[in-house]
Amino acid sequence: VEYSETPQLLSDFVDSIEYIRLSDQPLIPDTRKVRLSEDVQGNLYLDFNEIYKYTPRGKYLKSLFKQGQGPGEIHALFIPGIYNKAENYVLVKNHNAPYNKYTLEGNFIKTVDAQIDSTNIEVLTYWKNYEIFRYEKDIILQKGEAANLDSAYFCQVKDKTGKIIYRLPNHHFDIKATSPGRGTIVLLGGVIDYGEINRNLFWIRPNYVDTVYSTSDWTDVRPYYIIQRNNRAADYAWSVRMKVGDITREDAEREQLCNVYALKSGLLFNYLFNPKQQGAGFCPANGKSKTISRLFKNDIDSYCPSIDLWQAIAYKTLYQKEDYLYLLIDAFKFFEEGAKSPFPDLTEESNPVLVKLKLK
C-alpha cells in the first residue's frame, strides 16, 4: 500500500448516499467529539458531553439526562454512551463514578456498579442483548518483569441473564514484553474495533491482530477476514512492547495499520506511514489495497465533492448499522468550491448534516 494525495473513489464500496438535516438548535460541537447511534425505531442519538435524541428525520427531541451531581444526573460524561437497543436503555459513565442507566426516553433507572474489588468492568458494547465487556486494573510492573497487558482474553460476552457465554482468546498471550519499570501501567489492552455487518452478523478485531472475527450468536465465532500486512508494518508483538514502553527507535518508526471497519465488500482502514503521510484506504474482500489518502472522492452525487473518512475512522465517529455507515459532515463543507447544498434552508452556520452511506 502507498500514500497518495489523489482521493480514492467512494463508489468502491458505497452504493448511494442519504442526507438528513438536523435541527439547528441545540448547537452541535466539534464533529470529531460526537458519536452516533440509532435505536430500533430509527431515532438518532448524538453523543458528546450530552446525549441528544432526534427523530429519524433529524428533528430534535430531548437531552437524555440532566447535568449535575444529584441522583440520576451526570456531572461529566466520561465516555460515549453504551446502547442496549434490544432492552431500550443506555449506560452512561459518570466521571470517576459508576454507570448511570437510562431508558432511551431519558428516564433514570439505576446506578450500575462497574467494579469488583479493585478490578474495573469496562462495557464495550451491546449487540442483540449480549454484553461485550472486559476487565481492567491498575498494576505496577517491576523493572525487568515480563508481561502481556492484553491478558489471556481480549474480551468476554454475557447473555441477558448475566452468564458469561464466550471469551475471545488471545492466541498470542505467550508473547511478552519486558518492562523498563517506569511506573503504573493500566491493564486495559489496546483498542478493540467492532461493528455490525448486518442485523445477524457482528464483527470484532483487537488492534494489531491480523484476524477479524465474526459471529451471529457467540456460539460460533470464526475468522471473517485475515489481514496480510507488509513486513514494514507493526505487528502484535510490537503492540505488546509498546504498551509497557519496551520500544526501540526502530519500533517507533514502524508503519501502522490502525483502526478498521469490516464491511461485506471489504475492509475500510486507517494506515500510518509517518505523521505527514497517513490516511484511509479500502481493501476489497479477497483483494489488495493499493493506496491510502486523506479523502475519498464522492463520485456518487454532486453535493459534497469529497469525504474525510480518515478523520472519521481515527476519531471513531463512524457508526455502522446493518448495510450503512453514518457520519456527520460540517454544513460549511456543502458551500465549498464544487459542492452544493442538499437542503434549500441549509447555511454555513447550520448544524452538521447526518450522512448515511449505503454500502455495497
Where is each model-derived feature located?
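Conserved blade-ending motifs and adjacent loop-strand segments that build the rim/top face
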Residues: Y224-E250, G287-E322
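Repeated scaffold domains used in trafficking and secretory/extracellular systems
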Residues: T31-R35, I74-I82, D117-Y130, G189-V191, ...
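Blade/loop signatures of beta-propeller domains
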Residues: V1-R21
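Short coil/turn segments at the loop-to-beta-strand junctions that recur within blades
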Residues: P26-L27, F65-E73, D113-I121, H171-I175, ...
